[in-house]
A protein has these predicted regions:
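N-terminal strand-loop element at the rim of the active site
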Residues: 2-39, 199-205
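Donor nucleotide-sugar binding/catalytic pocket of nucleotide-sugar-dependent glycosyltransferases
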Residues: 28, 103-143
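Acidic donor-binding loop of glycosyltransferase active sites
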Residues: 56-58, 233-249, 255-259
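Short His-centered aromatic/hydrophobic patch
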Residues: 61-67, 85
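A conserved, positively charged/aromatic
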Residues: 75-110, 114, 121, 235
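A short helix/loop element that forms part of the nucleotide-sugar donor recognition site in Leloir-type
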Residues: 140-154
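Conserved donor-binding/catalytic core segment of Leloir-type glycosyltransferases
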Residues: 154-175, 179-182, 195
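Nucleotide-activated donor-binding/catalytic signature segment of Leloir-type glycosyltransferases, i.e.
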Residues: 197, 206-228
Length: 288
């Protein structure tokens, strides 16, 4: 948008819709969130209309369901079609054959490029590897977080650990492990506060665990914020960040120590010796 392109976004909605609209980016609500056949048919109709009405020049998809639908539309409408591969999808149960990677694919790391070539036999020339771009003005050591500290009851002498991730069942393992470790961490540090940021289909289970630990400790050590857009302010008060991928890079930009850990692997406290594996796996530690 800043570079003069007219950007149109379609999604099932979420916390970032207002931010998009405030930036002058048009958003269309399309039920792209699951494999429900009725939703997929409705999405196909809506996407076809949007592409025609908005005179879209390039279509870019980021997930399996929209890519599948847009792949079918692409064959009839002949628009340029690009996808981004953010992680390694399950290829079993026939899922490989409903995955469409478009005419060209952007992979977020070298291991994802290898995955695409090995599992989908994509030519190397059709895959471009990029990195997550971080807004270093938004994510910086200078971020003012006084409003967040007031909202969450964080005191200046609190030892804050922040965890950021989607809390889907496929992503929430480390959130649960961190919560399980809180009683031991609480013995080792003063005034512990753990902020868990994110939402998803496993949120209620994570919250139940957090409530149980808080009850045992007799105070609200763990705070779940749900989905948020002010991630920079939630990172700012922490002494340690736990997470992967873009969120881990955002914490690094804010000059925070980062433990890289997720459902796909663990490489521990990040330092220069772990830079190569971080870059190769988009800081998701796949296979580690």
């Amino acid at each position: 948008k800043r570079n003069g392109f007219n950007v149109i976004v379609t999604s099932n909605g979420g916390v970032y819709v207002k931010e998009l609209e405030d930036a002058g980016i048009k958003h269309y609500a399309v039920p792209l969130q699951n494999k429900n056949p009725l939703n997929m048919l409705k999405s196909a109709r809506l996407l076809k209309k949007i592409i025609k009405d908005e005179k879209i020049d390039i279509v870019h998809s980021h997930a399996r369901i929209p890519s599948f639908i847009l792949g079918k539309l692409h064959k009839r409408m002949k628009f340029p079609f690009v996808t981004t591969a953010h992680w390694a999808f399950n290829t079993g149960y026939g899922l490989k054959y409903i995955t469409d990677w478009g005419e060209k694919t952007v992979a977020v790391s070298e291991d994802i490029k290898t995955y695409l070539m090995d599992n989908y036999h994509m030519p190397a020339g059709d895959i471009n590897v990029t990195i997550n771009g971080i807004d270093t003005e938004k994510f910086s050591p200078k971020t003012d977080c006084e409003d967040i500290k007031k909202e969450l009851g964080i005191k200046d002498d609190d030892t804050v650990i922040t965890y950021v991730s989607r809390l889907d069942e496929s992503r929430s393992l480390v959130a649960k492990q961190l919560i399980e470790a809180v009683p031991e961490i609480d013995k080792a540090v003063d005034n512990l506060k753990v902020i868990v940021v994110g939402a998803g289909d496993d949120y209620n289970n994570v919250k139940t665990m957090a409530d149980s630990v808080n009850q045992k400790l007799g105070r609200d050590v763990i705070v779940l914020t749900g989905a948020r857009t002010d991630i920079n302010k939630l990172i700012a008060p922490c002494k340690l960040f736990v997470g992967v991928s873009r969120a881990a890079l955002e914490a690094m930009a804010a000059d925070k120590p980062v433990i890289i850990a997720g459902n796909e692997g663990y490489i521990g406290l990040f330092d220069e010796s772990k830079l190569a594996v971080g870059i190769d796996t988009n800081f998701c530690c796949r296979g580690w």
